[in-house]
Amino acid sequence: MPKVMKDVVHPLGGEEPSMARAVVRSVGGFTLGLSLATAYGLLELLVEGHSPWGCLVGTLTLAAFLSLGMGFSRQVRATVLLLLPQAFSRQGRTLLLVAAFGLVLQGPCANTLRNFTRASEAVACGAELALNQTAEVLQRAKQPLVSALNKIKAIARKTKEVADRVRKFFRSIMDGVKHIARALRNVWQWLLHIGDVCNSELGNPYLKCARVFDDAKDSCMMVIPQAYHLCYVLMPFKLALCGLASLVQVFCVIPKYIQPFLRQTIGTPVIQLLNRVRQEFEFNMTATHHFSVDLNASRSLSQVAMDLHEAVSMKLHRVREALALMGFTTPLLLVLLYLQALFYRYCYLNWDHYDNIYITSRFLRMEAVRSTAGLPTVLPLSAHEARRYIPPGSIFLSQWEKFFYILETFNLIRHLLLVLFLVFLDYAVFWVLDLARHQLQGEIVARSPVLVSLTVEGTGYAGNIYRDLVSAFDVLQQGNISILSRRCLLRPSEPDSTGYIVIGVMYGLCFFITLFGSYVSRLRRVICASYYPSREQERISYLYNVLLSRRTNLLAALHRSVRRRAADQGHRSAFLVLASRCPCLGPFVSHFWLHQAYCLGCGQPQDEGDMENTVSCSTPGCQGLYCLTCFRLLDNTCSVCASPLSYQGDLDLELDSSDEEGPQLWLAAAQRKDPEQAWLLQQQLQEVLGRSLSMESTSESSDLDEEKGPQQRKHGQQPLPEAHQPVSILTSPEPHRPPETSSATKGAPTPASEPSVPLSPPSLPDPSHPPPK
């Protein structure tokens, strides 16, 4: 059938709605659009917990689209109405599972991550508390030494003050001594240099006096060289006067003899005395203490705690981002459902085989019209067709619906197990952390069990030092260590019961969709049929033609199946066929394989006690055994012995010169049914085999078979080969002309039609691609 490419198929002239109905539909669509937008806004605000402004903007946008679209557009109205049952389809259930799992991620998973974060914060606080307590213990351990050092420093400061005073006193003494020394040095220098000054000022008196008289003598001798002997008159005066001048030389010689005496007797002892006094006031004070604490760690405990907290935060950053994105699943869900509704509407208008498996009331009316007109019909359906094609209101599911029903049930169970595990994990983590909080909610402080008191008596610097040391040990004993503090108390986050109720409701809705989604999804075809009735009539005609075409091909396939199983003598397996060919395997096969009769048409096993549902061929010597359905499809004629009579056409028979049983059975059946047809069949067989055939042997075998009776013929049946569904063998239709006394189903197949709707030949769908749901 040609595909309909128009999106809108207007109804027939008699069904065109009036103006009043159009107004009512527009008002109803406008109201329904506003209601749906309001429900979406409440869902986003109350369930998802989004911001009011974001919910307001989204609700107004959706309300404008839905109300105006459903009020003034027939296509939008049909698509939105399709969206409601589309939510109960397999794709809608999948999207609802995604939304529910998003709530699970935002609820239990986020709460579990929050509890892990709080646990890491408590661990970091405990590490910092341990660091502070360790530093405090170290400070208290250093306290005795620090006190001793402080006392020593105080003594040193006081000693320094005394030393400063002694230094000032010594400096005063030194200044006085230096003043005396300077005076003595001046005297010493005067005594040291007085001889030189005396000699430089006065010279040697005797020598100077003698030099004066000598100079006078020389001058005289130069003046009066002739009377130089007169110049020697001065010599007596020289001796007398210069002898008196030598007495003054004693004063210049005395300091030379006094200076060494003063150096040895006064200078050296005084210097030694001063040095000895200086040494008495010089002293060295050395205080040495050693205190070393080695902590082999590259990082401090506070840094380790902060690094631990940052590492946990970095690990959870992407998870938190994903959880934040899960809050926008509802708009995405609505958009995808709307796109799926558009896709279903497009497929309904353009693909004849899409979701076309329902036997509707229009289909039944077409069947009644064709039955009244004497045309071939398709009802009742075969067992295989009944599993595929169902009425829309039937409580039974089609074959594909059952398959998807089982698949979706297992998928839902898998999701429920995962969600239950996440919920259990949330409660387990909270229970463990809450138990730890309950056990550690107190405060533990380590105190010294025994206090030792020491008293130091005495005065002086040493007593003060020992007294300070003892007081420092008292401080060390009285110090308390906080092992557990309320500041680091773990406060786990309690699971949200309201969120769990919402999650339970959503998964309950998923379970409802899994159970009844197939029935609700059938409303999509009802909605499209109400909006596009002419398109629905075309789809029904297409389905009727498909069934009628398969019914015609079914008869030819059933004839071939019967002939094939009759050639194999009714054996189902290759081993039984081999045993029939080799007589030596017969006892072995009969010992292990029980005898069972099978329908030659469909291969269904037949119970020996239920003979009401089986039909045996009445022709003598024929092994034909059929179920009621196959025998009705064969026009109540055995296809083994009477196929040339019931299936007119070319003799497509595999015969050779040694085949005697088949032609004799055909002639016997023809003789019983119509002697004239028996004569014609005999002529055709003689032409095919190239020899003459007589009916005498046939009549003899007929007499023998009549004596055996039908009960012995039933026990003489051999096991039949494996059943094949007749509808799975698609062949080209062959001409078939049943007798005039047959029912309407025996007539020649013609395209299904109604007086007012012309039909075209059907285009068979691909068996490997079943129609999607």
From Swiss-Prot:
Transmembrane segments: 27-47, 52-72, 234-254, 323-343, 416-436, 500-520
Biological process annotations from GO: fusion of sperm to egg plasma membrane involved in single fertilization; sperm-egg recognition
Region (Disordered) residue spans: 692-773
Biased composition, class Low complexity, residue ranges: 692-701
Any one Gene Ontology cellular component term annotated for this protein: acrosomal membrane
UniProt membrane topology term: Multi-pass membrane protein
Keywords annotated in UniProt: Cytoplasmic vesicle, Glycoprotein, Membrane, Transmembrane, Transmembrane helix
Bias kind Pro residues: ranges: 758-773
Glycosylation sites (chain numbering): 284, 296, 480
Protein's cellular compartments: Cytoplasmic vesicle, Secretory vesicle, Acrosome membrane
General function of this protein: Essential sperm cell-surface protein required for sperm-egg fusion and fertilization.
PANTHER family (UniProt xref): DC-STAMP DOMAIN-CONTAINING PROTEIN 2 (PTHR21041:SF6), DENDRITIC CELL-SPECIFIC TRANSMEMBRANE PROTEIN (PTHR21041)
Subunit structure: Interacts with DCST1.
Name assigned to this protein: DC-STAMP domain-containing protein 2
Organism annotation: Homo sapiens
Taxon lineage: Eukaryota, Metazoa, Chordata, Craniata, Vertebrata
Gene designation per UniProt: DCST2
